[in-house]
Amino acid sequence: MKKQKVTSQKQKITYRVNEQIRVPEVRIIFQDGTQKVMQTAEARRMAEERNTDLIEVQPNAEPPVCKFDNLGKLLFKMAQRDKDLKKKQKTTTLKELRFHPNTDKHDFDFKTAHLEEFLRKGNRVRATIVFLGRSIIYKDKGLELAERLTERLSVVGNRDGDPKFEGKKLFVYFEPDKKKIDAYDRIRTKTGKLAPLPDEPEEDGENND
């Protein structure tokens, strides 16, 4: 049996369409979310009347699940989605800024403003809290700073896991959250708070993820 094939990012997806669907009945999922089990021949007739294709999307269901859609447009959307995903994966960068347990308010505000901006641009960020000399005995201060960072950056991102100690460094990772970023940008635009950031600190680091 001839099948229409398309390769997605993770797996090969094979669709049966129109006359390729040989089962006696199918479950149709309509665009409004309603469902109906009907004879396959009737479903094909409906597809023709709608000038669209009958596409089997869940062949292992009982009965198989189909929908009415334009196969060419569906495959194009999937190819475009995979292309966008690949592009996003290639351009995602890990941005890093360093702090100390006793980082003062000015330095904290300055650096977290940059971390916010990195997240707004879709980058992952890492805040590295460095314990110099014997300051490692003040781990609690480092963890408190990590919580302050988490609260400050929660408007545009989410913390990725718990803070992790490695030697005399405490690493805190954050992921951008598109919904939060969109909402945050709307508020900033409305209130006119889109002032340019100062130059980045010299100790900034940048690594490819």
From Swiss-Prot:
Molecular functions (GO terms): ribosome binding; translation initiation factor activity
SUPFAM superfamilies: Translation initiation factor IF3, C-terminal domain, Translation initiation factor IF3, N-terminal domain
An annotated GO cellular component: cytosol
Pfam family, one: IF3_C
Entry's localization field: Cytoplasm
InterPro entries the record matches: T_IF-3_C_sf (IPR036788), T_IF-3_N_sf (IPR036787), Translation_initiation_fac_3 (IPR001288), Translation_initiation_fac_3_C (IPR019815), Translation_initiation_fac_3_N (IPR019814)
Record GO biological process: ribosome disassembly
Keywords: Cytoplasm, Initiation factor, Protein biosynthesis
Similarity annotation: Belongs to the IF-3 family.
Role played: IF-3 binds to the 30S ribosomal subunit and shifts the equilibrium between 70S ribosomes and their 50S and 30S subunits in favor of the free subunits, thus enhancing the availability of 30S subunits on which protein synthesis initiation begins.
Assembly, per entry: Monomer.
The protein, known as: Translation initiation factor IF-3
Gene symbol of the encoding locus: infC
